[in-house]
Amino acid sequence: MAQNHVIKVSKKTLAEMTTVYQPNRLNKTVPYTVFVAKVGTTTITAYQSGKVMFQGPQAEKEAARWEGTSTTPKKKVSPQTTTLPADFGNWSVIGSDEVGNGSYFGPVTVCAAYVDKSMISKLKSLGVRDSKELTDPQIIQLSHVIKELIPYKLLIVEPKKYNEIQPNYNAVHMKVALHNQAIYLLLQELAPTKPEGILIDQFTPENNYRKYVRNEKNQVTEKLFFVTKGEQYHVAVAAASIISRAAFLEELDKESAELGFSVPSGAGSKSDQVAARILKKGGLDLLANYAKLHFANTQKAQKLL
């Protein structure tokens, strides 16, 4: 029997949900909504007011992913307001960030980077900061410099592999698994050195992250901190973001070179047109090498043929 479950979330959480459900968005317009998406049998309708309605047999389960962000039952501290120690920016820290989750073409890249306190000023002097403030050429150039200076672990999930594992994960679970693995591998490399903290650029409430980590073989659960816009709090996250972004851009360039035409980032109408071109050339088998097939862009591209 279908069920309805309604929660009310903050503007920040609504923005986060918009990103998380981007691959599952439906091509339909409903008045006063931010988006309508479908995950399995559950339809999610997010309204501009901050109300989010989950409909379907698994509605309550899907809504539970956002437990701790809802302001409906009682006032809770937003996970986005996590406070860090006053001098955290001067600690020796592992920072992690990911790129590509909302892009139809290209991989998902996740990087964990370790910045010892002795390297903080050096990286800042080189211009290591929020990657959104940098041009693509600057990001690629800085990435090469950063990788020569600090320990890091970079995971690249290319579209073909992504399409193989995606049915077994939701968007949040996949990101948790990748962040956890990148951090774990970096900790193994650093041993016996231990960071004073591990800062994850927050994409889901902390309790949700820890819930999914329990499914992983190698679980990193100590010294974890979660904040949105983590690059503003420690240069380690900025470094991880730059390395992740550069890897994503380089993989997009490889895809473009292989296909003989430019492959865009994002998930807009241009992606539909390029996908249709690839479908004409080699069908879904070829497209699976370059795009995340569960995005709505695939169906839109098929309609263009």
Curated annotation (Swiss-Prot):
Checking Gene3D superfamilies in the record gives: Ribonuclease H-like superfamily/Ribonuclease H, TATA-Binding Protein
Q: Name one GO biological process term.
A: mismatch repair
Q: Which cofactor does it need?
A: Mn(2+); Mg(2+)
Q: Name one Pfam family in it.
A: DUF3378
Q: Which of the seven top EC classes does this enzyme belong to?
A: hydrolase
Q: Name one GO molecular function term.
A: RNA-DNA hybrid ribonuclease activity
Its biological function? Endonuclease that specifically degrades the RNA of RNA-DNA hybrids.
Q: What is this protein called?
A: Ribonuclease HIII
Question: What's the source species for this entry?
Answer: Enterococcus faecalis (strain ATCC 700802 / V583)
Query: What taxonomic classification does the UniProt entry list for its organism?
Result: Bacteria, Bacillati, Bacillota, Bacilli, Lactobacillales
